[in-house]
């Protein structure tokens, strides 16, 4: 069933991967899919709960530290563990690693918003029980993580004991061999409060340096004819014990409420207790109904239906669901590279948000997209300070990786040097304006962001023979660092500069008083705006006459080509097996670079150049980055390479489900998940957002019968259905509009389906 991810075998070798796959979250709180009872000692677990943006600052140690290197980096923290539930069947501890597992089923219900384990277990002494665990992280009450357990004795069992714990002694996972995972600073929280207030158990943790606080307040409830209860404080936690006698079924519920300083202010424990008291009247079934209502609304617009391939249908729904679970829904947070499913990349926000994830929400849930932009706006002052540190008198340089605005990248060649992130962020603000026409947002936030990022480019580049050039930067391809005139960077900077000038003119015509106030606040002059226009108009975009392609940068095509065909499979990803300088000296791409620019800014080049460039760069791309395959799928669709488009899409759709990059244990690949949706909507369906409106050119993979999706545009919901030999469009909400279908204008009247054969 494509609405349900099922694991029907208890495979010990897949435990860590399944912890990520079966994680739960709501954008504020995330919990990995651990077993409540834990594992046997021979198996490791990354047991985790995370609050989006809740972090500590840790010192960066350099062998040689130079000016401008960050002193510290931010790190998402594994917070208080409230998952613990141990079950004793008489005197035998329930464990899937002892006795006999008679049947096992584990499900993630993506339409209903909960996960479950259904187990028939025979103890070493022969006692049989059925255990049904359900858990959810509430979309309606963002602070709530709830667990429900039903225990059914299948034999004459005298007593069952349930031991529930909350543990404040937690630490982060480290891996010294993988640069994508933290290598130190595992413990960054100390327990600052342990107490009980009536029936509520309370633990508070405080971060070492930021002094941010997090509280978990827990209540438990049992339905059993005969039971005894006791609780006690243990070291760094609280333990509750229920001893149930008789052979009747037992129902146990555990509600865990998390609050933190960033959202709840200084009185985090009082806030957690208050929320707990409001939950008393809510049964677990009530919470499930709230989940279903929320998800019905989400899937109504966000679902992508594929007729013809159940595995890929499961893949796209799983990826969209995990994006929803991880994306921040308040301006205090964004979406981390691994979301809230794990600790890879230390909970940092990258350009992944703007280029791969933001478009999904922009076209389906624009309010969520707006919050992502508001988070970037909230760190604008930090970006201004970072620009000054890098020697720029004006402008905003956004951090390559961050949580609350400070640069957290210690390796500047593949970090700070990726100046393109500022243009990527500007690009997302422009796309938001085109899709929503939110004039107030433009005046209050977007214009300032565009002006400050344009200032960065004007100060970074210089003119040679009338052409505007940008030196010593790194593009998306991290196997090629510190180059002059990276095509992607220059093309995105050009877009940024020209749109900043255009928005300045637009505000001058439509709301001159607002513009004047902004100019005065920024000390912005007319000469600066003219300089943006000139720099954009005269931006140098590398082009090779002999190959008739856009050169990735000034020196890339002069390098020796890496022999990918003869590189042993065990040497991938290359970054784990070759020194960076070895990679930098070759023509080899970690991911799409020039090809990505041609996707985002296809109007800047003719189709022949785009095709030639794709053919050239695809041959030397390793796809070591999970951000690569989706872009190659999208552009293969545009160029008519149907099989390539489909094959690359396959890679994106099930990358985590199949653990193809071998690091899903550290968390799910959020950008790739966004890329799955992009591969269908921007790839197969050919969607582009033009200034004139939506433009589509739908194609259908040979193996499919049809696909259907919805998109939002300027207050409308538009349904797109592509079948064999035809495509239909319908405005299901909002006013009618004109769209482009294969470059031809088509008017869509509200409620009337238009079918084109």
Task: Report the location of each language-model feature.
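Beta-sandwich/jelly-roll carbohydrate-recognition scaffolds of carbohydrate-active enzymes
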Residues: 2-314
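C-terminal capping/lid segments that line or modulate ligand- or cofactor-binding pockets
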Residues: 16-50, 356, 404-405, 480-507, ...
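Non-catalytic C-terminal accessory modules of carbohydrate-active enzymes
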Residues: 71-124, 130, 607-611, 618, ...
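Structural helix-adjacent loops and short alpha-helical linkers that scaffold large soluble proteins
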Residues: 306-313, 328-331, 363-373, 433-448, ...
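Helix-terminus loop motifs that line ligand-binding clefts
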Residues: 327-341, 367-427, 433-434, 440-442, ...
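Carbohydrate-binding/catalytic loop surfaces
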Residues: 337-348, 392-415, 467-486, 554-556, ...
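Active-site core of glycosidic bond-cleaving carbohydrate-active enzymes
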Residues: 349-378, 505, 521-665
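Acidic/histidine-rich catalytic neighborhood
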Residues: 456-524
């Amino acid at each position: 069933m494509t609405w349900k991810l099922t694991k029907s075998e208890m495979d010990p070798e897949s435990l860590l991967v399944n912890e990520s796959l079966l994680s739960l979250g709501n954008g504020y709180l995330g919990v990995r899919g651990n077993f409540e009872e834990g594992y046997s000692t021979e198996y490791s677990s990354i047991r985790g709960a995370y609050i989006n943006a809740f972090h500590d600052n840790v010192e960066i140690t350099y062998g040689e530290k130079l000016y401008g290197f960050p002193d510290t980096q931010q790190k998402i923290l594994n917070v208080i563990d409230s998952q613990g539930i141990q079950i004793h069947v008489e005197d035998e501890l329930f464990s899937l690693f002892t006795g006999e597992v008679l049947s096992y089923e584990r499900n993630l219900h993506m339409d209903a918003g909960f996960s479950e384990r259904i187990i028939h277990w025979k103890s070493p002494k022969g006692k049989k029980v059925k255990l049904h665990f359900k858990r959810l992280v509430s979309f309606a009450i963002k602070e709530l993580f709830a667990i429900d357990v039903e225990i059914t004795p299948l034999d004459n069992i005298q007593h069952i004991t349930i031991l529930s714990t909350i543990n404040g002694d937690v630490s982060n996972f480290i891996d010294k061999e993988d640069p994508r995972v933290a290598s130190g600073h595992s413990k960054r929280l100390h327990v600052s409060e342990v107490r009980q207030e009536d029936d509520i158990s309370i633990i508070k943790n405080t971060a070492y340096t930021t002094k941010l606080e997090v509280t978990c307040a827990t209540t438990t409830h049992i339905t059993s004819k005969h039971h005894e209860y006791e609780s006690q404080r243990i070291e760094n936690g609280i333990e509750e014990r229920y001893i149930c006698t008789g052979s009747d079924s037992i129902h146990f519920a555990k509600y865990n409420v998390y609050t933190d300083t960033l959202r709840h202010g200084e009185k985090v424990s009082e806030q957690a207790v208050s929320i707990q008291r409001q939950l008393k009247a809510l049964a677990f079934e009530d919470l499930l109904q709230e989940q279903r209502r929320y998800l019905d609304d989400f899937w109504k617009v966000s679902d992508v239906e594929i007729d013809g391939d159940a595995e890929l249908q499961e893949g796209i729904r799983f990826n969209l669901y995990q994006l929803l679970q991880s994306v921040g829904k308040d301006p205090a947070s964004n979406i981390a590279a691994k979301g809230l499913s794990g600790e890879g990349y230390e909970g940092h926000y990258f350009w992944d948000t703007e280029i791969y994830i933001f478009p999904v929400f922009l076209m389906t849930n624009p309010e969520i997209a707006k919050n992502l932009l508001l988070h970037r706006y909230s760190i604008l002052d930090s970006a201004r300070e970072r620009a000054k540190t890098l020697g720029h008198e004006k402008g905003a340089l956004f951090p390559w990786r961050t949580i609350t605005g400070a640069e957290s990248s210690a390796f500047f060649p593949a970090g700070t040097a990726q100046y393109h992130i500022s243009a990527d962020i500007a690009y997302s603000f422009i796309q938001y304006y085109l899709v929503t026409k939110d004039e107030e947002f433009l005046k209050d936030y977007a214009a300032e962001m565009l002006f400050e990022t344009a200032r960065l480019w004007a100060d970074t580049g210089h003119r040679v023979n009338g052409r505007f050039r940008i030196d010593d930067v790194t593009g998306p391809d991290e196997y090629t660092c510190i180059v002059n005139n990276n095509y992607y960077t220059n093309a995105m900077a050009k877009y940024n500069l020209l749109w900043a000038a255009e928005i300045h003119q637009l505000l001058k015509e439509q709301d001159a008083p607002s513009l004047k106030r902004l100019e005065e606040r920024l000390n912005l002059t007319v000469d600066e705006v003219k300089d943006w226009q000139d720099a954009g108009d005269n931006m140098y975009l590398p082009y090779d006459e002999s190959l008739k392609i856009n050169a990735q940068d000034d020196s890339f095509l002069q390098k020796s080509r890496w022999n990918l065909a003869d590189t042993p499979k065990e040497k991938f990803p290359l970054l784990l097996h070759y020194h960076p300088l070895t990679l930098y000296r070759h023509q080899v791409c970690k991911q799409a670079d020039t090809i990505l620019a041609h996707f985002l800014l296809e109007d800047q080049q003719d189709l022949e150049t785009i095709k030639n460039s794709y053919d050239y760069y695809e041959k030397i791309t390793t796809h070591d980055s999970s951000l690569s395959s989706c872009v190659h799928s999208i552009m293969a669709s545009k160029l008519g390479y149907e099989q390539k488009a489909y094959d690359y899409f396959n890679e994106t759709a099930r990358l985590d489900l199949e653990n193809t990059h071998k690091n899903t244990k550290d968390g799910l690949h959020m950008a790739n998940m966004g890329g799955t949706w992009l591969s269908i909507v921007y790839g197969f369906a050919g969607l582009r957002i033009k200034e004139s409106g939506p433009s589509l050119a739908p194609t259908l993979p040979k193996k499919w019968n049809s696909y259907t999706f919805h998109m939002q545009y300027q207050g409308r919901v538009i349904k797109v259905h592509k079948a064999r030999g035809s495509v239909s469009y319908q405005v299901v909400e909002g006013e009618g509009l004109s769209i482009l279908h294969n470059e031809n204008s088509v008017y869509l009247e509200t409620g009337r389906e238009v079918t084109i054969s």
